[in-house]
Amino acid sequence: MIDFKMTKEGLILLIRDYQNLEEVLNEITSRVTQMGGFFAKGDRISLMIENHTKHSQDIPKIVSRLRELGLEVSQILVGSTIEGKENDVRVESRTTVESTGKVIKRNIRSGQTVVHSGDVIVFGNVNKGAEILAGGSVVVFGKAQGNIRAGLNEGEQAVVAALDLQTSLIQIAGFITHSKGEENVPSIAHVKGNRIVIEPFDRVDFERSE
């Protein structure tokens, strides 16, 4: 179900398609514990989920479990397999979470997925059926209609913002909402009181989020 692979990109945790998240989390704990002295606290690894679209909502819990075990996820990879075919692994980010954001100057069309370990900034629209998975925050200078998952590394401090926030789904860390912002009103989604709230840009209140 899971395997650690050493590639030219470094150590990758490969998670194959699965049915039960709890089994995956337990196996991660077991494997890392068995490997004992191989890892040092704070070691960075890459994460690759074989069917990331199907399981993207599980990424925060997987990242959280790895952190509990002393490992940090430096990047998320998408691709079909890494066994003997390193070129099948497409690296969306070779930078750490603390890096500057990934800037996209185009519309993200239906069926397209953007994966980045830090912040994602889009100068364009995120169309319905598109998806963004970001380790940090997501800012869309346009209309956001697809699925946006933020805070996969940064956690609850991440935000999702757009000039028109009409998303099908917003996830920040382990919180999910299907709510939308006011139409044609620049809005920001952030975690407040253990839930995601969406507020107009000129009335957002971060001070009470903590």
UniProtKB/Swiss-Prot annotation:
Organism field: Thermotoga neapolitana (strain ATCC 49049 / DSM 4359 / NBRC 107923 / NS-E)
PANTHER family cross-referenced by the UniProt entry: SEPTUM SITE-DETERMINING PROTEIN MINC
InterPro entries: CAP/MinC_C (IPR016098), MinC (IPR013033), MinC_C_sf (IPR036145), MinC_N (IPR007874), Septum_form_inhib_MinC_C (IPR005526)
Pfam families named among the record's database cross-references: MinC_C, MinC_N
TM ranges: none
Subunit description: Interacts with MinD and FtsZ.
GO biological process annotation, one example: regulation of cell septum assembly
Described purpose of this protein according to its UniProt entry: Cell division inhibitor that blocks the formation of polar Z ring septums. Rapidly oscillates between the poles of the cell to destabilize FtsZ filaments that have formed before they mature into polar Z rings. Prevents FtsZ polymerization.
Annotated SUPFAM superfamilies: Cell-division inhibitor MinC, C-terminal domain, Cell-division inhibitor MinC, N-terminal domain
Family in the record: Belongs to the MinC family.
Presence of the UniProt keyword Iron in the record: no
Stated name of the protein: Probable septum site-determining protein MinC
Keyword flag Cell cycle: yes
Keywords attached to this entry: Cell cycle, Cell division, Septation
